[in-house]
UniProtKB/Swiss-Prot annotation:
GO BP annotations, alphabetical order: 'de novo' IMP biosynthetic process; adenine biosynthetic process
Family to which the UniProt record says this protein belongs: Belongs to the AIR synthase family.
Protein name: Phosphoribosylformylglycinamidine cyclo-ligase
Organism lineage: Bacteria, Bacillati, Bacillota, Bacilli, Lactobacillales
Subcellular compartments: Cytoplasm
Principal subcellular localisation of the protein: cytoplasm
GO cellular component: cytosol
Length: 340
């Protein structure tokens, strides 16, 4: 008996793995950008930092996954957008530090290599990379029978970006009186899905809930996370923003205070927050306390900007989308986030 057959009997299909690599090449090619060196399949991805033109480069990295949103992708057998979620979770964190994302690597672990399904996943990763302007320069697909069920997989990513040292956003520039501007989210994004799945556990996903304005539940739940790179980069390069917050797990309460120093607080005008229909549905069907919603979800704001009052109009002019003036920075009294 050959070694190959012995490996196959253990549950690892090497030929399927080769097929996955061939299938994803065309998707990886879509993400090419200046600075990429080498070819897909090398032992390490390479990037020429000098091609960025940054004078005092500081590398900024981020890694994340998509949590149990994956379980809904598996349940509904829809795998072509979950990769965008993975990219978004990484690059949005990097942009919050004032960096331009450069390249991305993905990691997929599965119980059984399904080349068609995994191509769908990577096509979503590639789409996210295109939207973010990053190159997909490497990755790993691990077939792990016994660790995962045959239909199960996990997905994680790693992104690296570069910032001009003088343009790093670390919260130190945020000051009392700054205006908080919100950029709309596309939906739930990629956090809070353990609760989301509990709330809608008995639903098929095909339901047209009245709160969802004609959209099927599963389409709303799997709406991919918005990528904010192309919206935020021009603002960073013009040094128009003092702080950026990526509103992810922990909602407003956990993420907004990460934008500024400990002696400051954010005062949020709840009436100005563009709450999406899905959050109203979650609150209703999940019997979730209203104040807790802001501790879990983005509530319709995926990226928050702290901007000096004199720069607000310029920021709004540069952003080709609705911009929500949802609050301001105040001196801290008790809580770091005050929702009025």
């Amino acid at each position: 008996m050959s070694e190959k057959n012995a490996y196959a009997k253990s549950g690892v299909d090497v030929e399927a793995g080769y097929e996955v690599v061939e299938r994803i090449k065309k998707h990886v090619a879509r993400t090419e950008r200046a600075g990429v060196m080498g070819v897909l399949g090398g032992f390490g991805g390479m990037f020429d930092l000098s091609k960025t033109g940054v004078k005092e480069p500081v590398l900024v990295s981020g890694t994340d996954g998509v949590g149990t949103k994956l379980m809904l992708a598996i349940k509904y057998d829809k795998h072509d957008t979950i990769g965008q979620d993975c990219v978004a979770m990484c690059v949005n964190d990097i942009i919050a530090a004032g960096a331009e994302p450069l390249y991305f690597l993905d990691y997929i672990a599965t119980g059984k290599n399904n080349p068609v399904k995994l191509e769908e996943v990577v096509s979503g990763v590639a789409e996210g990379c295109v939207q973010a302007g990053v190159a997909l320069i490497g990755g790993e697909t691990a077939e792990m029978p016994g660790m995962y069920g045959e239909d199960d997989y996990d997905l994680a990513g790693f992104a690296v970006g570069v910032a001009e040292k003088s343009q790093i956003i670390d919260g130190s520039k945020v000051k009392e009186g700054d205006i908080l501007l919100g950029l709309a989210s596309s939906g739930i994004h990629s956090n809070g899905y353990s609760l989301v799945r509990r709330v809608f556990a008995d639903y098929t996903g095909k339901e047209l809930l009245p709160e969802l304005e004609g959209k099927r539940l599963k389409d709303v739940l799997l709406e991919p996370t918005r990528i904010y790179v192309k919206a935020a980069l021009p603002l960073i390069k013009e040094e128009l923003v003092n702080g950026i917050g990526h509103i992810t797990g922990g909602g407003f309460i956990e993420n907004v205070p990460r934008m500024f120093a400990d002696d400051l607080a954010a005062e949020i005008d709840e009436d100005k927050v563009p709450v999406l229909p899905i959050f109203k549905a979650l609150e209703k069907y999940g019997d979730i306390k209203h104040e807790e919603m802001f501790e879990i979800f983005n509530m319709g704001v995926g990226l928050m900007l702290a901007v000096s009052p004199e720069n607000v109009n310029r920021v709004k002019d540069l952003l080709d989308e609705p911009v929500y003036e949802i609050g301001r920075i105040i001196k801290k009294a008790d809580d770091s986030v005050v929702i009025k």
